[in-house]
Regions:
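Aromatic-lined carbohydrate-binding surfaces of glycoside hydrolases
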Residues: 1-20, 64, 86-87, 134
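The substrate-binding groove and active-site-proximal loops of carbohydrate-active enzymes
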Residues: 20-35, 51-59, 134-149, 180-187
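Short, surface-exposed basic-aromatic patches at helix termini and helix-loop junctions that form
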Residues: 48-49, 65-80, 190-203
Length: 355
């Protein structure tokens, strides 16, 4: 369902990176749901790929110290996210770059770090190089494959030249998440990718590797972070999914529906099949994309469609159990005149209905 795992774990984590965020009246706090989302994602990957992944890119690169154990429990050896997470975890403002966009301290960024769990199954975290990755995602499509690959190799060699001596090779993580870059490339990026991989594999001062190979070889030398800062790959917070009024309504709707499911599950009124179906809809409603389109920071041009789909998933939780969905789920969240919050009574109110 592509959830923002730290927010499913606890919406209060949003305030760590955004102290001014408007938090839901009803705190969403379901660590078990976050763990199930990880398990089901890996189950699906195993079904499709024929083997269980040993690493993963969490949805939107959203991570926090609180969710690391969920990856370890499922046998995940490494995850990846954006460089903002590392800079905030190390309490530095940002990674400085020279005029060519090259990180001035590559020995910090170009290495995985262990997210400390105080046991043997610590999870290694690889951090995306923002500059090089964004060049692939947004710039190289306007260049010939030859010019684009030459520019990438120039950046990699420059990073190598400014590196200090380490006891192991540096590793550069180039990651694309959701940019839909290839449709903007000539020949869908095939020419660029073919030349890029050919160049990477024939350059004598560079070696391609997988995260698993790297940590198997150099794991004992990898340092540990004291704590992983809660953030996503492209910003040092979760502000795209929480913190604005519309997003607050959506999280409150989600929490109210989840509380209803808990009551239903604790009763003897429903069959196991009904409860399983209702919970599947609940997990789908926890996906990040519904919250992405709420608020003023993102616009699809048709936000009503996504808002309606989100509310329909919540309705399906009720209807799967043979119950009538509450009337407030018929009222669009994006209509500011349609609902008010009664902060004092800790409930959601609409213009004509209270929960």
């Amino acid at each position: 369902a592509h959830p923002i795992l730290p927010l499913i774990f606890d919406t209060n984590l949003a305030a760590v990176g955004d102290i001014g965020a408007e938090l839901p009246t009803n705190r969403f706090n379901k660590p078990t749901d976050a763990a199930i989302q990880v398990e089901k994602g890996l189950d699906l990957a195993e079904k499709l790929l024929g083997q269980r992944p040993t690493g993963m890119w969490p949805a939107e690169g959203a991570v926090s110290q609180e969710v690391l154990g969920m990856f370890a429990k499922e046998g995940v050896k490494w995850i990846a996210t954006g460089e903002h997470v590392l800079s905030k975890s190390l309490d530095i403002p940002t990674f400085k770059r020279n005029t060519d966009g090259i990180v001035t301290n590559p020995e910090v960024l170009y290495t995985p770090w262990y997210g400390q769990l105080n046991r043997q199954d610590d999870v290694a975290i690889f951090f995306r190089d923002l500059s090089i990755s964004d060049q692939v995602g947004f710039t190289y499509s306007g260049m010939s494959p030859e010019m684009a690959v030459a520019d990438m190799m120039k950046a990699l060699e420059a990073a190598r030249e400014v590196s200090t001596t380490m006891d192991r090779p540096l590793v550069v993580s180039i990651v694309l998440d959701g940019e839909n870059a290839w449709e903007h490339y000539q020949n869908d990026g095939i020419d660029f990718l073919s030349l890029m991989y050919e160049t990477l594999t024939t350059t004598d001062w560079l070696k391609t590797t997988t995260p698993t190979e790297y940590i198997e070889k150099y794991g004992p030398q990898i340092e540990k972070l004291d704590r992983v800062f809660p953030a996503s790959w492209f910003q040092p917070n979760f502000a795209t999914w929480i913190g604005e009024t519309e997003e607050t309504y959506a999280w409150d709707y989600l929490q109210k529906t989840r509380a209803f499911y808990d009551r239903a599950n604790a009763s003897d009124n429903y069959t196991e099949k009904q409860l399983e179906q209702a919970f599947d809809y609940m997990l789908l409603a926890e996906g990040s994309d519904w919250f992405w389109w709420y608020g003023s920071d993102q616009s699809s041009g048709n936000d009503d469609y996504f808002g309606s789909a989100f509310r329909n998933l919540l309705k399906n939780v009720y209807s799967s159990l043979g119950e009538e969905p509450p009337a407030y789920l018929d009222i669009p969240i994006i209509s500011p005149s349609a609902q008010l919050f009664d902060k004092q009574s800790d409930s959601i109110l609409t213009s004509n209905q209270s929960l």
